């Protein structure tokens, strides 16, 4: 499964190569998960991370070309220091966040619904369940969200409220 990290490519499926992710993780304290993974799993996690980032984030600016497969590179974007970002690069914070997210995806399926998440309380007598509107799992780890601050709007999982449970 070859990875295609061609900038603005029509069939690109990752923002970074395995080599770029390896370089990022070489400076990371918790590197064992990444270094223990096979190249195939690294590629899969990078592709999945890229896809999920594009699904969960409305990036600042506009796609540079209509033909590019991914949402980056983008036009009309400034970095956190207000410098214009070139339309022929993937900014380093996006690359680093992709690598970080890919490592998290190797550890667990962050797209799965965690059991019990969102439940505020459960009463056994006459059965009562109260759901929390704020206790919902997010696909993007907090560190990845922090790394991407200022690069777009992050959309979390749909929030939910309470439902009526009827005992039969």
Which ranges hold each PLM region?
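Divalent metal-cofactor coordination and adjacent catalytic microenvironments
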Residues: 1-168
């Amino acid at each position: 499964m070859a990875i295609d990290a061609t900038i603005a490519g029509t069939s690109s499926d990752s923002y970074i190569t395995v080599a770029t992710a390896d370089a990022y993780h070489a400076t990371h304290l918790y590197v064992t998960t990444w270094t223990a993974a096979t190249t195939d799993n690294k590629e899969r996690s990078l592709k999945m991370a890229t896809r999920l980032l594009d699904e969960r984030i409305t990036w600042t600016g506009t796609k540079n070309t209509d033909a590019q497969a991914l949402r980056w590179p983008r036009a009309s974007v400034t970095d956190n220091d207000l410098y214009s970002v070139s339309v022929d690069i993937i900014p380093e914070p996006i690359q680093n966040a992709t690598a970080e997210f890919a490592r998290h995806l190797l550890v667990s399926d962050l797209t799965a619904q965690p059991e019990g998440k969102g439940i505020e309380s459960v009463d056994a007598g006459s059965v009562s369940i109260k759901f929390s509107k704020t206790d919902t799992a997010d696909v993007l780890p907090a560190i990845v969200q922090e790394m991407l601050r200022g690069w777009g709007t992050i959309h979390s999982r749909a929030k939910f409220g309470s439902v009526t449970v009827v005992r039969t």
